[in-house]
Regions:
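Conserved anion/nucleotide-ligand pocket segment
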Residues: 183-254
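Glycine-rich, aromatic-lined ligand/substrate-binding cores of catalytic
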Residues: 225-305
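Conserved functional hotspot residues or short segments at active or partner-binding sites
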Residues: 279-386
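Bacterial N-terminal signal peptides
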Residues: 8-17
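Glycine-rich, charge-decorated loop segments at or immediately adjacent to ligand/cofactor-binding or catalytic sites
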Residues: 87-92, 160-183
Length: 405
């Protein structure tokens, strides 16, 4: 009798544990690629296909779009964005052939070439864009998409946008709008805030209509996605969207302080914690971390750190600074965080050449007056209100292009 009761208790415990694990399971989001594959013939049969993709163009099982479509469907050209088709290039991307299929590759990350031209598109009936974006204006993949949309319009080609989650849409819309003198730059193209909190498909629809590109585009939607999700809540397999975005904390760090990268500092590239380690040989890490912690930024803490990058800024030199640690990502105030980190870094930059160095971040941040006010330690209420009004105006327009709750 005792043994039977023990079995019942153990069985009950196992059932409760299993039920709990089911209730705690991550939601399963299906990407545009996953959904395209269910009905690919309708879109692709008998057509010559040009792919604009990188290594992130994978299905729920981690299989790459090139390997999924070739040779059943006729891929005539592959267009490579920054970092290349297989995502192993950190700087210059060249024309060539795909290492696996030997299909021709045209680089869209060259000094004089950022979009397909008429000759590239002669043997293409339909373009497919499938690249994982992270949701900040100064990430170049969205510009590659815009320029491809313009090329598609100019050459009478249809373009499919295979939607993917915004990796950090949960941080919301924030940051200054890109001022007019920076419009059309490759790292920041259109006047939107630093973070748009849209999927790449939503952004494509917004750009196409609001900026009157007028391309023939179709978004293959996600299913199961909500804007409040971080990427690691979608159930989709992880692929570094670029070589130095290696986990969710680096995505968040890039959102919060990636715009400061052009300063004379290391942002952790060439370390195991890119966009989580920030420093330079001339910083006092303890003072910098203490000042940031004193600001009591919600959802974050800062620890003094010394690190030696193996590449990029200050390669093989000891850098002193701080490690950004996320303690509660739901509590983060991105705009306040950017202002505080920028202000404290400015205080610690060497006086010689500081202002010239400081002005270099204006393009990424998007607003020269805002950058200047941080340097002066000002808390200009007028400027803050203007940015808030601009963000609200963008958010109001953005609303009609959202495809998901």
């Amino acid at each position: 009798m005792v043994r039977i009761k023990l079995y019942v208790l153990v069985l009950s415990s196992l059932i409760c544990t299993f039920a709990g694990s089911l209730s705690a399971a991550k939601p399963r989001v299906k990407t545009g690629l996953d959904n395209l594959l269910q009905n690919a013939d309708e879109h692709l049969k008998g057509k010559r296909i040009g792919l604009i993709v990188n290594h992130s163009a994978i299905d729920a099982r981690g299989r790459h779009i090139i390997d999924l479509l070739h040779p059943k469907y006729k891929i005539t050209k592959i267009f490579a964005p920054e970092h290349g088709v297989r995502g192993k290039v950190d700087e210059h991307v060249s024309d060539g052939k795909d290492t696996k299929t030997r299909l021709p590759i045209v680089s869209l990350y060259q000094r004089k070439k950022k979009a397909p031209d008429a000759d590239d598109l002669k043997n293409v009936d339909i373009l497919i864009f499938d690249i994982q974006e992270i949701g900040v204006r100064y990430y170049t993949y969205a510009t590659t998409m815009v320029l491809a949309m313009k090329a598609a319009k100019a050459n009478g080609k249809k373009m499919l946008i295979l939607d993917r989650p915004n990796m950090a849409a949960a941080l919301g819309v924030y940051g200054p709008l890109l001022e007019s003198k920076f419009h059309g730059g490759f790292s920041s193209y259109y006047p939107i805030p630093i973070a748009h909190a849209m999927t790449i498909g939503e952004l494509a629809s917004y750009y196409n209509s609001h900026f009157q590109i007028g391309a023939d585009i179709e978004v293959i939607k996600l299913t199961g996605y909500k804007h409040g999700m971080y990427f690691d809540e979608t159930g989709q397999p992880w692929r570094n969207p670029s070589p130095s975005i290696t986990d969710m904390n680096s995505v968040i760090g890039y959102h919060l302080a990636g715009s400061l990268e052009s300063l004379n500092i290391s942002v952790g590239r060439g370390t195991a914690k890119p966009f989580q380690l920030f420093g330079a040989p001339f910083f006092d890490g303890r003072k910098l971390a203490a000042a940031l912690n004193a600001a009591k930024l919600p959802g974050l803490k800062f620890v003094a750190a010394t690190f030696k990058p193996v590449r990029s800024a200050y390669s093989k030199k000891n850098c002193h600074g701080f490690k950004l640690i996320v303690t509660n990502r739901k509590a983060i105030d991105p705009m306040r965080t950017l202002i505080t980190i920028a202000r404290e870094i400015h205080k610690h930059l060497p006086e010689k050449g500081r202002e010239k160095n400081w002005s270099s971040i204006a393009h990424a941040v998007g607003d020269t007056a805002f950058v200047d006010s941080i340097a002066k330690g000002e808390q200009s209420e007028t400027l803050v209100q203007k940015i808030a009004a601009d963000v609200k105006a963008f958010a109001d327009v953005r609303q009609k292009y959202l495809l998901y709750p």
